[in-house]
Amino acid sequence: IINFFESRTDDMVGVITFSNSAMYVLPLTQNKEAIKAAVNATAGNALFQTNIGAGLTSSAALFSGIADTGSRAIILLSDGAGRIDAPTQQKIKDWFSRFQIGLYWIVLRQPGGISIFDENFVPRDEEQPPPQIELYEFFKTFRSPFKAYEAEDPKSLELAIQDINLKEKKPITYTERLPGKNYSFGLLLTAMGLASLLLCLKILEVKSFK
């Protein structure tokens, strides 16, 4: 993940972590050292809760007030899923649409766990679908771009990151302040020329008066 961010030299990156609630780790920045430290800081253990709703709303809020100058995307990396209530779902959909944010969801799937891509999975009678299936169906209703991946090992995670890197190639528009040019020599010559002209006119005026 760090290699992915470091390879995208002009990107701004922010980091939000979440378990039972969301935590701002890093606002949007181009500081590669800060990004690396923020990603490394997520390596610790978390609480046994997954408040994805808080994570997504906090992540979308990072784009508030930021000019849209290129690709806008959130990479949701989670080893679990949680249920999101209806009002929060609507808020997430509205914000992602308003800020034109694409969503990439990388599911860190446990060996033998349920696959979100299993079309033949049927829950037991009177049971809700598993949270990850329910969340996948919700994400598919987004008006903004969405793609999901499953990663069971570092290699499959790397392949998912590579695919995201290929998809996020929208040109970035930015403003660059160019250093000004030194016009002092030219202005000095102009001033000397004008002074010489005035002196000549003064001499002619004196001769005419005489």
Please give the residue ranges for each predicted region.
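DG-centered beta-turn motif at the end of beta-strands
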Residues: V15-N20, S59, G70-K91, L103-Q110, ...
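Extracytoplasmic/secreted envelope proteins and their assembly/folding machinery
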Residues: I2, K32-N40, G53-A60, Q89, ...
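Von Willebrand factor
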Residues: I1-P27, I52-L56, A73-L77
